[in-house]
Amino acid sequence: MTSIILASGSSIRRDMLQNAGLDVEVQPARVDEASIKSAMLAEDAPPRDIADKLAELKSLRISQKNPEALVLGADQVLVHAKRLFDKPEDLSEAREHLELLSGQAHELLSAAVISENGKPVWRHIGRAQMIMRPLSAPFINAYLAAEREGVLETVGCYKLEGRGAQLFSRVQGDYFSVLGLPLLEILGFLRARGVLVE
């Protein structure tokens, strides 16, 4: 049976795959995301290309060490007003992000690349439009106090499957892509490859 490796340390991505019935091994890929993003932004690369490139590099890094496995690399970027957001470094930066995104729409792009034998064999980018409601200062204070360092784990300072749902008035697009993986498309590929029963 073909083994599946997740080239990510994300517990959310791991849980999504395992909850969908997949037996996955986790091997986080170490790539210099900041340098790659910076270089691509300097070349005016669109955000979708940045997410796709990071997912591909993670997938390839682990695939080269595990050529017989299907290796899934993933990356998510948040775009607002032509600005690419990174995960906040601390709670002060998380507050700034929430204040900037408050009452605004932003887009999440979740890229996934599967490699085998050191080559990409499948890729997909899921999209979601996130409409954040206007957030009051007391709400932001209470939210950050409740979520604490958990907001530093995600690019948008929220987990939609938890308290982060309170930030939004509307979400358009794929729910799983909001969580960080275009799960349904991944499952479709695995069925087509015979890894999952059709």
Regions found by a protein language model. Name each.
Residues 17, 55, 75, 94, ...:
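Residue-level signal for inorganic ion chemistry
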Residues 97-99, 110-123, 127-128:
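Anionic-ligand binding region
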Residues 1-70, 138, 145, 184, ...:
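N-terminal polybasic phosphate/anion-binding patch
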Residues 15, 83, 149-150:
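Non-catalytic structural scaffold of enzyme domains
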Residues 23-34, 113-119, 153-165:
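Mobile beta-alpha loop/short-helix "lid" or hinge segments that flank ligand
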Residues 76-106, 132-134:
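Active-site-adjacent loop/tail segments of enzyme domains
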Residues 123-197:
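Active-site oxyanion/phosphate-handling segment shared across diverse enzymes
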Residues 79, 113-116, 133, 170:
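Short beta-strand-to-turn element immediately C-terminal to the catalytic PLP-Schiff-base lysine
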